[in-house]
Design a protein with these regions (language model features):
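N-terminal secretory signal peptides
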Residues: 1-18, 45
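N-terminal export leaders
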Residues: 18-38
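C-terminal segment of N-terminal export signals and the immediately downstream linker at the start
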Residues: 37-67
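Alpha-helical scaffold segments that flank or form the walls of functional sites
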Residues: 70-83, 88-114, 119-136, 160-176
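Histidine/acidic-residue-rich catalytic or RNA/ligand-binding cores of hydrolases
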Residues: 91, 123, 149, 221-228, ...
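Active-site gating/metal-coordination segments in enzymes
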Residues: 128-131, 136-210, 261, 268, ...
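Divalent metal-binding pocket/active-site signature
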Residues: 173-253
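Short acidic/histidine-rich active-site segments
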Residues: 214, 271-273, 300-321
């Protein structure tokens, strides 16, 4: 029965009805060999031939700040960009080899999320990795607290909001950050977390750097709204913000309701736990495909960002995993099988992330 489904049949499934039929089939076979075969037919560099779409409009003077230098956003037209990953956790040599392998799969740019203030060693390691790979590396920074997972150092909890703003701006300039992130909060946002979110929002206004957040993996729709409220309360244009871990919202919490509200307010919906199941959420791939399809059907394709939040060496290619190719080699083939056309896949992997990351430097 599996072999009765051809790639041509799948690519012709462009209506909502046929896409849903394809999606139901994915759920029935739980990511069977059909999906793998389709992905294999388009694997390697040919998988991401990003040449068929016109570039988005970018503001005059906009750049994307990478460790290899500031670049024009048009320079990220021919490779996928992952907006939320963890590169600096790996050994330098291993990270370089993994990135080179993922470049063959179509990766062009990767954002390294911070889970605390950057140490000099972290900065040196990321700079060394960037010098040895053609994949553009963007260093992000900030402060991270999600009770039960990580808490702020005492110094951050004791600092004033003004002092945090000054430190964020100073570190962003001296370490060449290209974004603030991942900025985290707990299931119930604590006063110190509100202080940090306000400080990051104010630092954004002083630098122009975009912001991406972390919401708890335990499924927390209200956390997304709290983060937006605090950040917007400081005067931030929410089109410069990604609310992260939106793929961890469980079906019983009606993820589409949260996703559409985030998008209606102007922010990006960060579906950034793709290609694997996070230990604290266990959302299957079929549910994550449904999230993408539902957002597209609701008219919010311009607000979707994809990533894997990958930094676990056990899941690297050297250990028979997909590493930073998880989105490209595991998740994108499922989108194709579900009927998502190539021009939309390009938008999700190329155009949306560079619209988010492009900024006009200020200050």
């Amino acid at each position: 029965m599996v072999h009765q489904f051809s790639a041509d049949m799948i690519r012709s499934s462009t209506t909502q009805h046929s896409r849903r039929e394809a999606f139901r089939f994915i759920g029935a076979v739980a990511g069977s060999a059909v999906v793998s075969a389709i992905g294999f037919q388009r694997s390697g560099l040919a998988q991401q031939s990003f040449t068929s779409s016109e570039a988005p409009n970018f503001p005059d003077g906009a750049v994307i700040r990478t460790l290899q230098g500031d670049i024009n956003p048009t320079e990220l037209a021919n490779g996928a960009t992952l907006f939320h990953e963890h590169v600096g956790r790996a050994d330098v040599d291993l990270a370089v080899e993994e990135l080179r392998a993922s470049a063959f799969d179509g990766l062009g740019c990767i954002v390294d999320a911070a889970t605390g203030r950057r140490s000099p060693e972290q900065v040196r390691n990321l700079e060394a990795i960037a010098a040895r790979t053609a994949v553009r590396i963007i260093m992000a920074g900030g402060y991270f607290e999600d009770i039960g997972f990580a808490i702020y150092p005492v110094r951050v909890a004791e600092m004033t909001e003004d002092a945090l703003v000054e430190e964020l701006v100073t570190d962003a300039k001296s370490q060449r950050w290209g974004a603030f992130g991942e900025i985290a909060s707990s299931l119930e946002m604590r006063p110190d977390e509100r202080k940090v979110h306000r400080a990051v929002a104010r630092a954004h206004l002083l630098t122009g750097l975009p912001i991406f957040t972390h919401t708890p993996h335990e499924s927390c729709p209200s956390c997304a709204m709290e983060q937006l409220d605090v950040i917007e309360g400081q005067g931030v244009d929410l089109s410069r913000v990604v609310i992260g871990h939106m793929a961890t919202i469980k079906p019983e919490h009606r993820p589409l309701t949260t996703h559409t509200e985030v998008a209606r307010r102007g922010a990006f919906v960060g579906l950034d736990t793709l290609g694997h199941e996070m230990g604290r959420s266990r959302i299957p791939a079929s549910d994550k495909v449904r999230m993408v399809l539902d957002l597209i059907d609701a008219g919010f394709e311009d607000h979707i960002l994809l990533s894997s939040d990958q930094g676990n060496v056990n899941q690297f290619k050297v250990n028979w995993g997909h590493g930073w190719s998880s989105v490209l080699m595991q998740f994108v083939p499922k989108l194709r099988f579900a009927g998502v056309p190539e021009e939309l896949i390009r938008k999700l992997l190329v155009d949306n992330p560079r619209r988010f990351l492009a900024f006009v430097p200020t200050g």
